[in-house]
């Protein structure tokens, strides 16, 4: 696909609007982050958003509108409290969730009966929506799980060749995604913090409940709730400790790894090889604006581990805290805990030694890596089935599994149940985030869908891995995608298990 690069001139916006009208995808600027847009009422166009990003299908999109009248096309019920919020904060960085109109396709809502809507405070975005004559569904315009794009260059790096057009609207003013509040229930619930704070919302609504994650098995009502988000290729670790503890720890780690440190202007000098300031401790807006660019820049500098300080959860700092801690997978290292520090240092040094000493001994057991979206359903079932069959048949091979967007969650209850039916126990499995090291160590990487493969190849462009990453369809030469059973009952999971068993039997018979 050849991607058009467009300006914010009206003549170019008319080209972009025609692309939207014809079912295409256009990246547009907003005041928060750049968005990957499509006609919110066109299910096929919306599907292409998920394909381009490698985004999980149950992760809902936000529909963007250019005027308040458009809200009636999307929302079946708009409570008076929501109208007061719209009067105060629209256009602006606030997304509200409502019960959806029947016309809104489930592809846009992630299968939910609710729709997320906002009116962006960006003239280019609103003009595009106006010219397209339809609400535009748009998540952030990055590969799913990576830091959101806040510049035109970020978009071209991630999405050139994946979308029809990218509009250059300059740098995003705010730099983190919108605040999301659910107005579809009996009481308002804050689902994602942003530039509009809980305190500001409470001035209009009274008490606002805050929920920023979902329970296992639940569908997320808002982007950013379920899957690992905002993550650079480098590991991100939050450090808890005093200045001397942090200095000494960074100095030791810098002898083993290329380390980066996110700091504030008031901080003393650290010995990390790469240091990027998020601005002043007195200015949360500066930290919001700089955070995603800083994470991306650390990757460009070849940093292996990014260390960051603890962040307050007060007012606007809550948004910075949310994004940074999600990027870290909630990993916080307490430097006062000598055992935890020792475990961390031993673990990182062992990884270096393992990488240096590993050989390609042909007599070793072959390693197969199964990959799905969250590593809680399909891939752990595949891992269990493969290892069971290899042991039964005397085949010297071993399987592991990982997810594109995993956060150490337990295996899904239904997956464990249907595997237990055939005598395989996967109940102790915890989801693992896919890493370059996992791919390096595998002889064969089998993924569930073409979208998974595309996401992996795009995310690890620096590695030549297209000779080991396959869908079952590619590897076996027959149409064999494995649909996600997430949200289904045990019958759906049983069907998925049996499909995987059939495919793994064919893989073992073919050899690798």
Each language-model region and where it sits:
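Phosphate-binding/catalytic loops
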Residues: 363, 444, 450, 454-512
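Short helix-capping segments at alpha-helix termini
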Residues: 56, 390-396, 461-465
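Conserved active-site segments centered on acidic
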Residues: 361-441, 509-512
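S-adenosyl-L-methionine/SAH cofactor-binding core of RNA-modifying enzymes
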Residues: 244-263, 426-442, 446, 453-454
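Active-site-adjacent structural elements in enzyme catalytic cores
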Residues: 1-341
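Short, well-ordered alpha-helices that flank and scaffold nucleotide-derived cofactor binding pockets
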Residues: 51, 157, 322, 384-392, ...
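Intrinsically disordered, low-complexity terminal tails and inter-domain linkers enriched
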Residues: 336-363
């Amino acid at each position: 696909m050849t991607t058009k690069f467009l300006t914010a001139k009206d003549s170019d916006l008319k080209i972009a609007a025609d692309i939207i009208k014809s079912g295409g995808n256009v990246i547009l600027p907003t005041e928060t982050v750049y968005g990957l847009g499509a006609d919110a009422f066109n299910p096929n166009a919306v599907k292409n958003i998920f394909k381009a990003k490698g985004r999980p299908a149950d992760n809902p999109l936000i529909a963007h509108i250019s005027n308040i009248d458009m809200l009636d096309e999307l929302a079946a019920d708009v409570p008076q409290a929501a109208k007061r919020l719209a009067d105060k904060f629209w256009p602006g960085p606030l997304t509200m969730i409502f019960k959806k109109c029947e016309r809104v396709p489930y592809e846009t809502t992630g299968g939910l009966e609710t729709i997320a809507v906002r009116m962006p405070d960006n003239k280019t975005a609103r003009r595009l929506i106006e010219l397209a004559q339809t609400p535009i569904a748009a998540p952030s315009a990055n590969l799913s799980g990576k830091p959101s794009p806040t510049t035109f260059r970020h978009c071209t790096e991630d999405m050139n060749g994946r979308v029809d057009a990218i509009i250059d609207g300059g740098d995003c003013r705010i730099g983190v995604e919108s605040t999301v509040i659910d107005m579809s229930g009996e009481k308002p619930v804050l689902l994602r913090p942003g530039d509009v704070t809980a305190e500001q919302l409470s001035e209009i609504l009274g008490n606002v409940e805050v929920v920023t994650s979902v329970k296992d098995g639940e569908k997320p009502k808002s982007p950013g709730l379920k899957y690992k988000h905002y993550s650079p290729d480098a590991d991100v670790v939050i450090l808890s400790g005093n200045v001397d503890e942090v200095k000494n720890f960074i100095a030791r780690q810098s002898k083993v790894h290329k380390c980066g440190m996110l700091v504030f202007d008031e901080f003393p000098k650290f010995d990390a090889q790469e240091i990027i300031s998020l601005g002043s401790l007195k200015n949360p807006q500066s930290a919001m604006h700089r955070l995603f660019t800083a994470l991306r820049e650390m990757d460009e500098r070849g940093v292996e581990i990014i260390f960051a300080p603890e962040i307050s959860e007060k007012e606007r700092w809550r948004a910075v805290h949310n994004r940074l801690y999600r990027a870290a997978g909630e990993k916080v290292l307490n430097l006062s805990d000598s055992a935890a520090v020792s475990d961390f240092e031993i673990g990182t040094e062992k990884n270096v030694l393992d990488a240096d000493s590993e050989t390609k001994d042909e007599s070793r057991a072959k390693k197969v890596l199964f990959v799905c979206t969250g590593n809680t359903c399909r891939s752990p079932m595949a891992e269990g089935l493969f290892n069971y069959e290899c042991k039964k048949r005397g085949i010297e091979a071993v399987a592991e599994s990982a997810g594109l967007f995993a956060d150490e969650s337990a295996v899904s209850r239904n997956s464990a149940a249907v595997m237990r039916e055939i005598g395989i126990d996967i109940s102790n499995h915890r989801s693992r985030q896919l890493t370059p090291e996992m791919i390096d160590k595998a002889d064969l990487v089998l993924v569930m869908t073409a979208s998974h493969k595309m996401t992996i190849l795009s995310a690890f462009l620096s590695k030549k891995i297209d000779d080991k990453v396959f869908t079952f369809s590619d590897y076996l030469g027959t149409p064999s995608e494995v649909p996600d059973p997430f949200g289904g009952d045990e019958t759906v999971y049983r069907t998925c298990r049996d499909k995987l068993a059939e495919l793994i039997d064919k893989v073992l018979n073919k050899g690798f």
